[in-house]
Amino acid sequence: MALVTLQRSPTPSAASSSASNSELEAGSDEERKLNLSLSESFFMVKGAALFLQQGNSPQGQRSLQHPHKHAGDLPQHLQVMINLLRCEDRIKLAVRLESVWTDRVRYMVVVYTSGRQDTEENILLGVDFSSKESKSCTIGMVLRLWSDTKIHLDGDGGFSVSTAGRMHIFKPVSVQAMWSALQVLHKACEVARRHNYFPGGVALIWATYYESCISSEQSCINEWNAMQDLESTRPDSPALFVDKPTEGERTERLIKAKLRSIMMSQDLENVTSKEIRNELEKQMNCNLKEFKEFIDNEMLLILGQMDKPSLIFDHLYLGSEWNASNLEELQGSGVDYILNVTREIDNFFPGLFAYHNIRVYDEETTDLLAHWNEAYHFINKAKRNHSKCLVHCKMGVSRSASTVIAYAMKEFGWPLEKAYNYVKQKRSITRPNAGFMRQLSEYEGILDASKQRHNKLWRQQPTDDTIAEPSEFLPETLDGALDAQLPCLDDTTHPGLPRSLAPGGPALPCCFRRLSDPLLLPHHDETGGLVHLEDLEKDALLEEEESQPVEVHKLVQHPQEGARLCEKDVKRKLEFGNSKPRSDSLPQVEELEKDGSPRTGRWRRASTQLDRSLLDQENLNNNNSKRSCPDDLERDAMFGILSKVKPPYTSCADCMYPTAGGTPEAYMERHEDPSSSAICTQPTFLPHVTSSPMAHASSRSRAPERPASGPANTSPFLLPAGSRKPDVSGSGAGAAPEPPASLLEPSRETSKALPKSLQLKNPHCDKNAANMEVSAKEEPSPKKDPKPAKDLRLLFSNEAEKPTTNSYLMQHQESIIQLQKAGLVRKHTKELERLKSLPSDSPAACRDSATCRLEASIPEEGSQEPAHPALCSQAGSEEQPVGGTLQKSPTSTLPRLDHTSNFSKDFLKTVCYTPTSSSISSNLTRSSSSDSIHSVRGKPGLVKQRAQEIETRLRLAGLTVSSPLKRSHSLAKLGSLNFSTEDLSSEADTSTIADSQDAKCGLSSSFLPEPQSAPRDPAATSKSSGKSAPEHLKSPSRVNKS
């Protein structure tokens, strides 16, 4: 296969042509001169040359002195034949034919010109060369193609052309040459029929010039005129198979199957149809003379299928060299990009199309895999430009087909088998050689490894075989993926709940899987591998059912679900909340937790039906209760979860430190933008909204004034990491246990003004408040009370002046969220409540009923009683049941408060300083501000704090400095966790409980109309905050019990 460009030159026939056609217009001289300078490019196969409709494109010109090495002597013969023509005539096709004389070379040439009415007129010329090295040729036959021209296959490797009573038989030297001749002749006959060319008319008069030029030897002329009596020079079928019987239909079916296999394995440029038939007879072991016509027709059918490019995708064609040379077809199909996967085939139209060459041969040892990446980008370039790309090799069977299969595997994430079957279905002759199949298998492993690195680390494992496009994981498209992630949404009894978890389904154990496990396999039971949750939850179920107040049973239709609301949360959080394995004892917890982190807070626009399903699933998977697991397991889970690395999403600094002059409505609009790309995976606490627990309390004090809030007054939540999905839309009665009104009211009030990431201070509040949103929407909506929003604006302006004081409280409250994942939130919350109940500088704020209910806004694993006994009487007297659904018991938490006194502030300091995935800790090493480096109010800067965190974590995990340092460097590649030189050398820090006490007092004062509290002495605060128990770090048993 070659592309050869020849230059037209003046010929002796030009003068005679001009004299014999003096009736032509005067402008024909200019046209003739233009034709003399035109280059003519030909698409060449062995035995045939097809003119390319390229005109005088300068990019396509080539020098004849350097013919293509695969073109043979055809370019020289073609140049001689061009010089034989008139200047206005063109060669459309030249096909080499067999001859009875071994030293002679014969060509059937299709010559065309533009007629009087700019119509195409075609004739056939028989051209003879005395030898292969001859520099001259003669014309031995001229055949006009009239409108009655008919073409038939002779069944012996040739075809006959009959017109106006004359018939000639032509036998091309190869199947490919015959196929090219048949296509060109078919189009020429169509033109003759359309314009009704008939003998005696004005058409084809110019053929008389060539008839006058017939000058071949008489033996050659006789050969052209006696073609109907010419026997093929090929040997007949072997006599061995002459007497074998045949069975019609059965034989035809075998012929179809074997003929396709033979043609796909043969070089059609170097074999004839007779040779293919002989090979077919050998394989079928029978004589096929009576099936010659059937074989030729099937051969043409197969050639037609191989000739037509196959549309694999909307932007991708797979074809052969013939398709790459068919300009009309390329332009008609909208192809602008051509990927040439051959070494022996040229680019035919370099001035018209964008080409990319992969110069390889079709051999098993060829390294095609190295080129698939560049081929992928080239094809996608055509896709991005809304165009189409043709990928071709010689036949469109092996090299180009392998490239298209590799493209499908990478573009759509398909396995090799699926991609191969898909391309095979679109183009049935697809058959990569054995070497390319091995490379495709290797390429599949490379792509799988790449998915493990880049996709599966931060993505939930898909539950089906659908292709996961990158856009499916954006916030805008996650709603559309809801049906795929929740297979049983249309289950009316338990919507959104997998069958294995539904009450009627099989009771499969819920396990955690390793990062290397491709599927969730319940039957795996290796040591340290799978952690079954059933035993961890039985005690929690019993304990929660016993401790639940009687009044709550009045509210919840199904008493058992009140405990399940909290019970299943551990499973959900451990399954979807964490990021990295901390130790070998619990690798699955962090691996499954990291899958959920990127998706936190992205389910804002789900429909009512889907959210009702999600709500039921959430209620069946909530578990904040205590876990009866071994002490070492709980400790490892605690410190493994707290040390997880956050995926590198957009920083939450904008959420944490916006401008102080912004209004609550401005923050509301900014956080509710569904197209926003900044997704906070952790709850962020603005400096001027750190008093949101007080805002909760103030709204709770107004609960009797406003019994319920309609859906218009609520807004979606952005849940913290550890929460799975927010439940915003309403659900039917009884779909989920309705939470107590003490949590319902604050969520209603604050959701209107606060950003979604600031409304709730721990995951348990998130769950309950989200459920209360649902129940709130079922109630009628009274007139909105504008007073809470006004107070909140006051809070915004007051607290904007104390970012330093409240930053430590932010860290403390974020640690609550992380501790709750490990099942330690009860003790930590009690300690915080006990600290907040100590005397403060603002008694007026404490006397306010809102302050008295501050602790109640931090609930305790499903129990709705007040947290501190000193505030119970006032809370119980002022807070009336809403709709008769809630009554508080002021004494139910006294035993639990005594239990939490074992925890010292040093231990809480250790936990509080344990690194979390908040935006503060993740940005420490990248911060160069004075707040991060220098001390603030006698306390070390954030960099020193982080050094303290890292050293504390290493000591409690029983590790040396070098071992986690190496591990952290590997984690840094994925989670942007960078170590500085100060990370490993830090002095002991003071207790952070004093910080939280300072922040608490600042909160109380900020609730007043004017900021009245002056900065307090940190030393004095430390004294008032109570004891310091360094022995807590020395006592691992007490840590284990926590």
Curated annotation (Swiss-Prot):
EC number from the UniProt entry: 3.1.3.16, 3.1.3.48
- Give the residues annotated as active site: 393 (phosphocysteine intermediate)
Compositionally biased spans, kind Polar residues: 1-12, 675-693, 886-900, 985-995
Region Disordered, residue ranges: 1-29, 576-609, 668-766, 858-900, 915-942, 985-1042
Q: Write out the biased-composition intervals (Low complexity).
A: 13-22, 697-712, 917-935
Q: Where is the DEK-C domain?
A: 249-304
Q: Which SUPFAM superfamilies match?
A: (Phosphotyrosine protein) phosphatases II, DEK C-terminal domain
Changes after translation? Phosphorylated. Inhibitory phosphorylation by PAK4 promotes binding to YWHAZ. Phosphorylation at Ser-970 is decreased by stimuli which promote actin reorganization and lamellipodia formation. Can be dephosphorylated and activated by PPP3CA/calcineurin A. Phosphorylation decreases immediately prior to telophase.
A single Gene Ontology CC annotation of this entry is: cytoskeleton
Residues where N-acetylalanine is found: 2
- Keyword presence, Metal-binding: no
Tissue and organ expression note:
Expressed in brain, heart, kidney and thymus. Also expressed at lower levels in liver, skeletal muscle, small intestine and spleen.
List the catalytic activities from the record. O-phospho-L-tyrosyl-[protein] + H2O = L-tyrosyl-[protein] + phosphate; O-phospho-L-seryl-[protein] + H2O = L-seryl-[protein] + phosphate; O-phospho-L-threonyl-[protein] + H2O = L-threonyl-[protein] + phosphate
Q: Name one GO molecular function term.
A: actin binding
Q: Which domain of life is it from?
A: Eukaryota
**BP terms from Gene Ontology:** actin cytoskeleton organization; cell morphogenesis; cellular response to ATP; excitatory chemical synaptic transmission; negative regulation of actin filament polymerization; positive regulation of AMPA glutamate receptor clustering; positive regulation of excitatory postsynaptic potential; positive regulation of synaptic plasticity
Q: What does this protein do?
A: Protein phosphatase which regulates actin filament dynamics. Dephosphorylates and activates the actin binding/depolymerizing factor cofilin, which subsequently binds to actin filaments and stimulates their disassembly. Inhibitory phosphorylation of cofilin is mediated by LIMK1, which may also be dephosphorylated and inactivated by this protein.
Assembly description:
Interacts with the 14-3-3 proteins YWHAB, YWHAG, YWHAQ, and YWHAZ. Interaction with 14-3-3 proteins inhibits phosphatase activity and also blocks recruitment to lamellipodia and stimulation by actin. Interacts with actin and this stimulates phosphatase activity. Interacts with LIMK1.
Annotated protein name in UniProt: Protein phosphatase Slingshot homolog 1
Species of the source: Mus musculus
